[in-house]
Amino acid sequence: MLAKVKLPNHVTVGSFKVQLVRIPHEIAYESSDYQGSFVSKPPLKIYLDEEIIDMGGMDAVNLVLHELCHLGFYQYGLKDKEEEHIVNSYGNFLTELLMRSELKGWLLWQIKNA
């Protein structure tokens, strides 16, 4: 098995750089019963339940992608947009995320080792 790839400290998609912040499981659930949270005011941050991230696999990937989709929604200004605009924007966003961002290595490791 290859060495485990750590979740990056930040992800850059286009001109948007978002910090990935791991928080203790107890804090995530005590503060508002969430596993992750996107903060859309600068500096952009995503808070992630470290227990889920440490477990890795499908749940960790789902959590990270879910929160990053909030970034895409914010980045492309998708509130009140038509379906085709939303789908096209997410296609562009996910392509950038999967092909060029700092998250690529972590995602590939998770997929190969799930």
Please give the residue ranges for each predicted region:
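Active-site recognition of the HExxH zinc-binding catalytic motif
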Residues: 62-74
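Metalloprotease/metallohydrolase-associated module, dominated by Zn2+-dependent proteases
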Residues: 1-58, 75-114
